[in-house]
Amino acid sequence: MAPKTLAERLAELEDPTPKDFDPEDLERAGPDSDDEGNEAADPNAGREHYQAVGKARLRRQDPINLGKQYAGSKISREALEAESDDDPFRPRSSDEEEDSEDEEEEDSELGSDEDEDASEESEEERPQRSRTSAKDSKRQRKESQVSSDEKDGEGMDTDGSEETEGSEDDSEDGFDEDDMSGEFSSDDDQEGDEDGDDDEDEDEETDNRKVRFQETSKSDDREELRRLMSSDQKTIAATISQAAKADAAKGRAVKQQRATFDALLNARIKLQKGLTAINRLSVTTKGSDETPSIDGEAIKSAESAALALWSTLEDLRLALADAQTQDESKKRKRPSAVSVATSTDSLWKRMTDLESDAVPHRRTVLDKWSLKVRGSTAALPNARGKLLGASASSQQTISAVIDAQVASETGDRAAKRRRHSSDEGPEPVYDDTVFYQSLLRDLVEQRMSSSDAITNGIDTLHLQLPSRQGIHPITGMRKDKVKRDVDTRASKGRKMRFDVHEKLQNFMAPEDRGTWTITAREEFFASLLGKTASGLLREGDDEDASAAEESDEDREEVGLRLFRS
């Protein structure tokens, strides 16, 4: 293409219209200009002899892969403008504003001309022909209006726009013809007036239909949004309420379990004094000739109380067994009530039968809850390269641990009795000191942790109850050898030994705010003790004199020490 001439360049400079370039037009690389001065400068100018080297990794701007959900879609300008036309809040352009102003001016001019024509004419000069033509035009417009109502929203818009344009064209044509010819007939003026009124009414009706259609569509969208939001809120509230109900049920179950455990522990604590008293009872041997004094009434009352307690415990165990069994046919029948005449062997047999039936269920429940409560421990290698988590003690069930604990306790007590007793047989005593102490320790620790009351009670707790250092933390069994924690570096003065004392709390030095002096206090107490002030002062003078004499003697003795060998 030939370069531009000077005249063309001057015309471009004098043209005040700014050049508009579409930024979304990807096919165009830039503004079409053949001017050499507007061309971009070559960045490699003067560097042709350099070796071509790519950008460094830090200077290279690699695109960030955000994923498919962040990828946009390309649309045309027409689709974008079509979407923006539907927006009632979009900004209006200058062309649209000018068109609306022109239409308003034309409508005002037509209305003024029609008013002048109508005032000049009289009703007598209007012929019958204008009336018939007006009626025909009204009838045609009503038919077109009915047909436009049956169509959808888009049809309404197009028909209304065509009718308004047609009416405007007709009015403009009529106005021009009247100006050119200069002849204004009364019939044409009347018809033009009626046509203008009908066109305005139709325009208003079409505008009202559009507004109503837009309002109904917006209201439907809002109702749909409200319905979706309400359904989402109901779903979220239902899930939250279900989770809260489940947590509340778990909390109530745990609270009930703790209350049951506390009640059983309270009963065991109350039985401790009775068990201690029973173990102190003397046991008479079969070959002894001693006949202790027997109180028949006390024995009968104790026997009846023991049988009542035994009956209550048996009823409780039978109720628990029936609750565990769902089948009615497998439920145990209630035996006859015990009495004083019932033999001890029958009582023992009934107890062993109940125990044998309850043992499997008890062991199953204990193992299940022990596995749930026991946390998962990581397998860590020890000094020998073995895994600590793979030990046999961690794989044992709680029922096996309890059996081993009971067996060890029974064996230890039997060995102690054999060492301390004579040739006589073992005394039938009930001894669960270790278990009872563990229960007490758990109870005290729970109370101490729940209430931040007294910290000094922990020290008294360790003094009163035996420590748990000799019990294995997993199996619960006592260790044979307890390794003492001894600091090997503390010998030979390599480590300073000290005791850390607690800080003094709420300490405040005494402050004397009294009005009495020390002399007044001494006189007051001297009068209470029957001494006079003069005697008290005389005693003070004697003490001062003796102290002065002693100080003089000390000085002389110190001076003589210099000459001692």
UniProtKB/Swiss-Prot annotation:
Belongs to the AATF family. GO terms for cellular component: nucleolus. This is Protein bfr2. It is found in: Nucleus, Nucleolus. Transmembrane segments: none annotated. Residues 1-225, 404-430, 537-565 are annotated as: Disordered. Keywords: Nucleus. GO terms for biological process: maturation of SSU-rRNA from tricistronic rRNA transcript (SSU-rRNA, 5.8S rRNA, LSU-rRNA). It comes from the Eukaryota. Signal peptide: none annotated. Its main location: nucleus. Residues 95-124, 155-206, 540-556 have a biased composition (Acidic residues). It comes from Aspergillus fumigatus (strain ATCC MYA-4609 / CBS 101355 / FGSC A1100 / Af293) (Neosartorya fumigata). Residues 1-31, 125-154, 207-225 have a biased composition (Basic and acidic residues).
